[in-house]
Amino acid sequence: MPTSFVSALAQVRPDDYESAIGAAHRRFGWTAVIIMGVVGLWGLVLAVMRREPGRYYAVGATVASIALLVQVGMGLWVYVNDDAEWAGNQHVFYGIVILFTFSFAYIYRSKLAQRAALSYGLLGLFLMGLGIRGIQNFGQSFGG
């Protein structure tokens, strides 16, 4: 039986070393990455079919973007407020790269809109890849 996001969030139990926000960040990281990947693939399918993204795609892209930005926000909050050095600076680095990617997508939004399905599909897959790298590098740091 599927559970709602709110009931799933209520089940999050933090460990001794992290806050509830940290536990939510850890638990829902893959959810945000998968949603972004699905929307990215959806955009590529639309591009191959030579169709413009419609309202449903815009809603999906918005949900995926919000999910990923909430993840980054929770991660930064945990890093600043919980002194989460255990996360490793590579994990934090990829969160910051995700923020920069969203910033550049906003700056170049008029250029991206010229071939919207292809551009936003590739952007979604790129962001998914950054999220995967961030998860894979959890606990690792640059240098020694």
Whereabouts are the PLM-identified features?
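Cytoplasmic-side transmembrane-helix entry/capping segments in multi-pass membrane proteins
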Residues: 56-64, 115-124
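N-terminal signal-anchor/start-transfer transmembrane helix
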Residues: 33-49
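A generic, lipid-embedded transmembrane alpha helix
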Residues: 64-78
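Loop-to-helix transition at the N-terminal end of transmembrane alpha-helices
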Residues: 49-68, 89-90
